[in-house]
Structures are given as structure tokens and as C-alpha cells.
Amino acid sequence: VAYKDPEDANKNFEKYGFNNHRFIEKDGAQCYVIWNDTDAIIAFRGTEPKEMSDVKADLNAIQRQGMHNTGDVHGGFQGEINKVWDDLNFTVADIQDRNIHITGHSLGGAMATICAKRLEEEGIHPHCLYTYGSPRVGDRKWVKTLDVTHYRFQNNNDVVCKVPFWMMGYRHHGNNIYI
């Protein structure tokens, strides 16, 4: 749904009982936040090949220090979440009492993973993280300090799940589920 036009997406949200929704977009980085009385979903859009800022983010594999000295993360992925973070964090302040589910595909999966970690560091504990075709996001230290139930869905032939290379210090987080 993160790839849909906001108007079409809103119709789908309401169909499934999520009458509250917010679309956040800045410089190519996008996410939806939808919620009802008990649950909230934060969904991040992945790479759109025609979106140059997405391609630049994917290629910027230089590790940068994560928040609170908890290890290093992919600089490009961190840069993308930084673009939407202020607006997202403002919205999350209103929904933090709900079961927060975070999801994303490809680049969006990486953004979702960083989002889950940042929320934890702010004392908000996501209920669950679901990523699809996500690349590796952080180094061993960063991955070990992420404490959220994470279902990482991956097609064994998807090259995105194999980058950045583990030889560069990157690691996956979560329970891997091959589809």
C-alpha cells in the first residue's frame, strides 16, 4: 500500500477499519501512518528506480554512527529516515498507546528497521516489525541492541537481501522467513 497514490491508499485503509491516516513525504522518502483505537501501522515505501534520491540512498553504504552510540548503520538508509523523522515522531506521539506495527519493503524495510530502533530508544516499544526484501541495515553491535520481534521475509533469489555485503560489517536482524 505504501506504493499507492495517497487517495487510493486512504480508501483501502478505511475499508479495513483504519479511519485515521497520515501520509508523510519529504524529498522522496515516504511513509504512511494509519491507526484505529487499538492498533497503528507505520509503512515505508521502498526504492522507486526513477527516484534518484532512493538510488543515492541505496548506494550510500558508508556506515554512520547510530543514535545513542549503539553501533553503526547504513548512511543512506539513515539519511532517508532522517528526512521523515520529525513529522513521523510528531505523529507517533499521538498513537504511542496503541500496538504499533512497523513494515516496509526493500529500502522501506531498512527504514522500518531503523524506525523501530529509534522508537525503542525513545521508550516506545513497537509491537512487531515486518520487513520484506530488506537489505542489511547495521553492524553487529547495532543489530544486537535492537529488541523488537522482527519477521524478515525474503525471497532466496532477491539480491537486495544480500547487500550491503556482510564483509563490510553489515548484519541482518530478525527471524528470517523464506518465501
Task: Identify the role of each PLM range.
Residues 1-103, 107-179:
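Non-catalytic, mobile gating and regulatory segments of ester bond hydrolases
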